[in-house]
């Protein structure tokens, strides 16, 4: 058994992480930290976690654990690392964006960095959009087939914005609504480009990324296309070969939709040749494969557990 601690456990990703850890057979939760919820029972804040009614949020717990997860929001993890000394031998998995381009952290996309994650002490968990998009493109990059501009439209649920209230997270604004934000300038683009260059060093194509807010709570659907002369048969071979030993990325001929993946750590991908273009659809749960589930997947690899330990989850389906 390993002892785990969660910093920033009062929000959406922190709460989802506690849900996974509470049922993980190889884990004991050592502490749950939250400045805003300090002194409250975890079950009083995350009211489905009845079994954690005796675990209380602490504002400043001693960092005594085998691994610490940082779920603090973007820009806050680096401050935490500056102000706190993580003891030697304590591993760290950051779910924010602070260290995704930092060479002192291993980028935690198992489908890209599987073996490096196994020996890592510090992991930077990928972004949710970045995960969905990379899993659609990695087989092409590995075979140096990304040679034209890439067009991406992707929509995310409201939990992707976090728990803090804002104008665009109010129910009355989000419900029955859809909107574009950060067109061509989303913060996940640099980490996507870096990963593609890791496999295809000469990659220098434009990523035309249009992110969208949806009126649902969970899930990401990414629709991606670019010109390519690769045949459908070769596309099928590329994807089946790349993902044959990856337990959470599923390649399908069916039309992917969110109900296939919500409440799971799976990413479902379809690839089709459409005239002169290749079209890829990628779907995942932004709180699981896009955040907390992938963090647990990384933890499993770091400690030598089966990759799917504690992550055999069922989709909502309907």
Give the ranges of each region predicted by the language model.
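N-terminal Rossmann-like NAD(P) cofactor-binding subdomain of oxidoreductases
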Residues: 1-183, 202, 272-274, 317
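Electropositive phosphate-/nucleotide-binding environments in soluble metabolic enzymes
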Residues: 11, 74, 130-131, 182-190, ...
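Predominant activation on well-ordered alpha-helical scaffold segments within soluble catalytic domains
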Residues: 18, 134-141, 189-193, 240, ...
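C-terminal active-site/capping subdomain that shapes the small-molecule cofactor and substrate pocket
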Residues: 225-318
